[in-house]
């Protein structure tokens, strides 16, 4: 049995953090329950036996740390709610486990926290930095919108996507906070959202929410150079849709991207050691607004959360040879679910 967690909005019926048990032998979820009620816990991160979740209380915003026990149940360690500048949308941890990074979409800012490397607790907010870059012409790009922050494969920087400014910004970082390093621009109105790095550290898959495209980019010393791009929806689809999550299979052979509105998952074959992508197929996600999904460590199953409609959680069996997925379970619900982790 594999334990997993789903983060959610708490605007309507969402509970914050759900816990589920994935039965990999039967390709289904045997249990899905409220794991911990945490307001606005829209993104989660697991670091061994500690889980971090976006959180807010009133006007105070930040991140909470929780201990995962032997049964997969969650227990609060502490919270660091040191800002009034808005709730985050992404969290990640540095390789040395000393720092936690947070991206805040609404305010267009990034945050950096100090961590206790022994307990995983959050010690303090080190810095909150606002983006101030020229924005695109799309109506959603009225100001900068930091959407992702994570350490680069070389370990030297953090890379931040800005959906409002159509770019990736890299920063040096230390005990004092962030220092601007380089920026890589993409097309106007792309709405650059997330990055998934290939294990070789040379190539990155950059997804753009507004243009519904994925770019293959070569990464080198804080800079991203686009090599090619692919549409993640059918060319003849003219409905309202927005790209959401991106994940690589653990064997690095296939890339998966979810589309909210078209309600699908696009599957690409990874070619030439990560340098190229080739569309395999686009499969219905089995629900409405597939905000996030994740792939079990065995590479056999994919679990997808749907933010809208019935908020069904779908489980797909995955063919390791073709990359294709087949729906096998849609009996569980996680209201307002927007993040899936194992």
Curated annotation (Swiss-Prot):
Question: Per UniProt, what is one GO molecular function of this protein?
Answer: 6-phosphogluconolactonase activity
Per its UniProt record, what InterPro entries does this chain match?
Cycloisomerase_2, Lactonase_7-beta_prop, N2O_reductase_N, WD40/YVTN_repeat-like_dom_sf
- State a GO cellular component annotated for this protein: cytosol
Highest taxon of the lineage: Bacteria
Entry's transmembrane regions: none
PANTHER family xrefs: 6-PHOSPHOGLUCONOLACTONASE (PTHR30344:SF1), 6-PHOSPHOGLUCONOLACTONASE-RELATED (PTHR30344)
The entry sums up its family as follows:
Belongs to the cycloisomerase 2 family.
> What name does this protein carry?
Uncharacterized protein SAS1845
The species is Staphylococcus aureus (strain MSSA476)
């Amino acid at each position: 049995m594999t334990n997993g967690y789903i983060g959610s909005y708490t605007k309507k019926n969402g509970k914050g953090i759900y816990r589920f048990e994935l039965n990999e032998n039967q390709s289904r979820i045997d249990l899905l329950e409220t794991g911990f009620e945490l307001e606005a816990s829209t993104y989660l991160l697991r670091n061994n036996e500690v889980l971090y979740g976006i959180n807010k209380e009133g006007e105070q915003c930040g991140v909470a740390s929780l201990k995962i026990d032997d049964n997969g149940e969650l227990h609060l360690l502490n919270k660091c709610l040191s800002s009034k500048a808005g709730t985050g949308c992404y969290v990640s941890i540095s390789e040395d486990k000393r720092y936690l990074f947070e991206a805040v979409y609404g305010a267009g800012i990034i945050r950096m926290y100090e961590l206790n490397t022994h307990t995983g607790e959050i010690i303090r907010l080190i810095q909150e930095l606002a983006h101030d870059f020229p924005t695109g012409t799309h109506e959603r790009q009225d100001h900068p919108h930091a959407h992702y922050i994570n350490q680069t494969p070389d370990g030297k920087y953090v890379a931040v996507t800005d959906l409002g400014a159509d770019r990736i910004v890299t920063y040096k970082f230390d005990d004092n906070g962030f220092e601007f390093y380089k920026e890589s621009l993409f097309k106007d109105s792309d709405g650059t959202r997330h990055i998934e790095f290939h294990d070789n550290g040379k190539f990155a898959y950059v997804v753009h929410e507004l243009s519904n495209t994925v770019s293959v980019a070569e990464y080198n010393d804080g800079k991203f150079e686009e090599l090619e791009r692919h549409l993640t929806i059918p060319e003849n689809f003219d409905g309202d849709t927005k790209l959401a999550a991106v994940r690589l299979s653990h064997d690095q052979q296939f890339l998966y991207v979810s589309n909210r509105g078209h309600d699908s998952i696009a599957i690409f074959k990874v070619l030439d050691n990560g340098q190229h992508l080739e569309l395999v197929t686009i499969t219905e996600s089995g629900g409405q607004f597939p905000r996030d999904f994740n792939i079990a460590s065995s590479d056999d199953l994919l679990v997808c959360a749907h933010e809208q409609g019935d908020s069904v959680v779908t489980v797909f069996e995955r063919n390791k040879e073709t990359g294709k997925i087949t729906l096998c379970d849609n009996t569980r619900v996680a209201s307002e679910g927007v993040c899936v982790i194992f």
